[in-house]
A protein has these predicted regions:
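Juxtamembrane segments of multi-pass membrane glycosylation machinery
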Residues: 69-70, 90-112
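Transmembrane-helix motifs of polytopic, lipid-linked glycan transferases
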Residues: 111-131
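Short acidic/glycine- and proline-prone juxtamembrane loop motifs at membrane-interface regions
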Residues: 155-161
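Extracytosolic helix-loop segments that constitute the early lumenal/periplasmic catalytic or substrate-binding loops
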Residues: 39-47, 56-84, 90
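Specific aromatic-rich, kink-prone transmembrane helix
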Residues: 123-126, 163-177
């Protein structure tokens, strides 16, 4: 008998069962692990940093807040504000909608970015599962999920995580067509 056992009484340890579940479901496992890590990073940065972590976040937050309040005019920032909003609308429209619904809170933008980051991890796992065994598909998804730069860029209010999610999804569509 082992001195300390994690045996659950139903045929294996809890860790082994969790790993078996993740290997069986690499796409959803990668998504939820990635989302959990990014959400934790977003919450931590909100608690530890007053303001924004990366200066460009402020631009997206400001133009989306103004747009959600109906105050983003063509005169704002000499026309650049409206131009930036329009040229990044794939990111600023959902952010503006969140601000309109729930108020202009930075965490909403961070959760939007975190979701895009999690989609990237899931897409990587799905793409890998097209060509590799499930264990390797999980490894691909978790690589994206835990890669430090991916965590950073998808836990701040920047459009980069959306771009990676769209690129990964495009690769996935091409692989399955």
């Amino acid at each position: 008998m082992r001195p300390h056992s994690t045996h659950t009484g139903t045929g294996g340890s809890a860790v082994n069962k969790a790993v078996a579940f993740l290997v069986k479901h690499p796409v959803s496992g990668s998504f939820f692990i990635s989302l959990s890590i990014r959400t934790a990073a977003a919450v931590a940065s909100n608690l530890m940093i007053d303001g924004v972590l990366i200066p460009d976040e402020g631009q997206y937050l400001l133009i989306s807040r103004l747009a959600s309040e109906g105050e983003l005019t063509s005169e704002f920032w000499g026309g650049y504000g409206r131009s930036l909003f329009d040229s990044t609308r794939a990111f600023t429209w959902p952010l503006t909608a969140l601000f309109w619904l729930f108020g202009p809170h930075r965490i909403l933008g961070q959760l939007l970015s975190a979701t895009f980051g999690a989609i990237s991890a899931a897409a990587a796992a799905s793409l890998a599962s097209r060509f590799l065994r499930p264990r390797f598909a999980l490894a691909a998804g978790l690589t994206v999920a835990i890669f430090p730069s991916q965590i950073l860029w998808s836990s701040v209010v920047l459009r980069e995580s959306m771009i990676w999610a769209l690129l990964a999804t495009m690769a996935l569509v091409i692989a399955y067509s």
